[in-house]
A protein has these predicted regions:
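Short, well-ordered strand-loop elements centered on a beta-strand within folded domains, enriched
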Residues: 32-36, 78-85, 118-125
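A hydrophobic, small-residue-rich beta->alpha segment in the mid-to-C-terminal subdomain
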Residues: 103-148
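Short acidic-glycine loop/turn motifs at beta-strand connectors
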Residues: 27-30, 74-76, 114-118
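Cysteine/selenocysteine-centered motifs that mediate thiol-based redox chemistry or coordinate metal-sulfur cofactors
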Residues: 146-160
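Long, hydrophobic N-terminal alpha-helical segment
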Residues: 14-19, 141, 150, 154
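Phosphate/ribose-recognition catalytic cores of enzymes acting on nucleotide-derived substrates
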Residues: 49-95, 102, 108-109
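A short, polar/proline- and glycine-enriched secondary-structure boundary/capping micro-motif
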Residues: 43-49, 95, 130-134
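Charge-rich, low-complexity N-terminal segments
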Residues: 1-55
């Protein structure tokens, strides 16, 4: 039976803004990959439409400043693209009663890549308004550059 996982998306103050659950697909020292099903109402973001039942394969890292979600359509299984959140490195912990808990502080800056390669860098104004120190700003910008390079090369979580 797959191991369950609960994901907490945190704001900069460390408060939970969204929580969801999924199933662990694999885990290593610095990464957990999970599958979660989108349970919210349909959302058309302009560059992707997400709907109830869409399957997300989510990659979280304890040593990287981002997470990556590969999104698949609920009805036909077609790949929609990768949604990437720039975050502080995730905390991945075993829960006392079993399963895992993943917690990541969202830094507002996001990256989306469509299957054809078109890129969208999102929420730059919101990111710029956060009270981050120079080291965090640098780490976040480096994370975005790393994501773009990995996506262009089809490596890491972008390998299909």
């Amino acid at each position: 039976m797959p191991e369950t996982v609960v994901v907490d998306k945190l704001n900069l103050a460390g408060e939970v803004s969204v929580t969801w659950s999924g199933q662990v697909l694999r885990r290593s020292e610095h990464e957990v990959v999970l599958e979660a099903i989108f349970t919210h109402s349909s959302r058309d973001l302009g560059y992707v439409r997400m709907g109830p039942g869409d399957r997300f394969v989510e990659h979280y890292y304890t040593d990287r400043w981002y997470n990556v979600f590969a999104i698949y359509d609920a009805e036909d299984g077609l790949f929609k693209g990768w949604y990437c959140n720039i975050t502080r490195p995730a905390e991945i912990n075993d829960e006392p009663g079993g399963g895992l808990r993943v917690r990541a502080v969202d830094l507002a800056l996001d990256y989306f890549r469509q299957p054809g390669g078109r890129e969208f860098i999102l929420d730059e104004e919101e990111f710029a308004a956060l009270p981050l120190d120079a080291a965090e700003i640098s780490a976040a910008r480096a994370a975005l550059a790393e994501l773009r390079a990995l996506a262009a090369a089809g490596q890491g979580p972008f390998a299909q």
